Amino acid sequence: MTVYGFHASHEQVPPADLLAAAVRAEEAGFGAAMCSDHFSPWSVRQGESGFAWSWLGAALQATDRIPFGVVNAPGQRYHPAIVAQAVGTLASMYPDRFWAALGSGEASNEHITGDRWPRKDVRNARLRECVDVIRALLRGEEVSHDGLVTVDRARLWSLPDTVPPLIGAACSEATAAWCADWADGLITVNAPHERLRRIVDAYRSAGGSGPLRLQVHLSWDPDPDTALAVAHDQWRTNVHGPPASWDLDTAELFDGVSEHVTPERVAEAVNVSADLGQHAAWLQEYADLGFDAVMLHHVGREQSAFIDAFGAEVLPRLDATPAGPARAEEAR
């Protein structure tokens, strides 16, 4: 069966409100939660970007049982040893309730260091070095490394009992296949079914193991016009695929290139409907593709009505299961 979780969008919701939403989601029956670690939003209209790591500590403490995950990009804005320390601390305090998905990053978050923004192949190579450093540190090893990142005699003094899962984040077949060599699972975002099948097949065919997670962007309101208007206002900057989504470096630039994006174009990237039955059907289709967890992101800034409606009317229609413990299958 599939876990249906809540995506906490730091780019759109103030941290205290987002914390209350995560608690509300658990109470409503969502089986998991996740967020992305961003320094800036995708649009000035979104208007927020709280610090994921401090929020995660509060969210794990405020909830009782659901696991949380974070999508993070080590290597530029974060030294991998700092990411390892953050992951290890949360996993130590909240065993079996935390996982981290690691990706190569986006310029909109990473440019703040003032360092050059590398090519995608270089970012992937840097990410792989970071993964190896993070995993070794979480196993209790002392690490020195000299490559695209430099580590000098780093050691974690506070360790979790078990190494939490390090998940690969991928939006393309090539990246999914590349992740298979090191990841404890895969997370991607909603796309046409055939493309999702290819991404999953690329990961599994390359030997990838562990659970498959899918983040689904959706917009719901009892009024269909409002549902579409909210999606267009909040998420039209997010219809652009790579390399634009990787390389644009400010919210203002995203707004500029999205000025003429139509509501109809947004509806190709966001599941928009006033019909809760339609949303349930869409989500079941994703589960039928083989995803073990489907993380729901309502793209509006107001989350309460969405959480309540989906908890009461959508989740009961789905073949859902509570999330199991967040554990890596084996040491790599």
Task: Walk through the language-model features, giving the residues of each.
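Active-site-adjacent structural elements that line small-molecule/cofactor binding pockets in enzymes
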Residues: 1-332
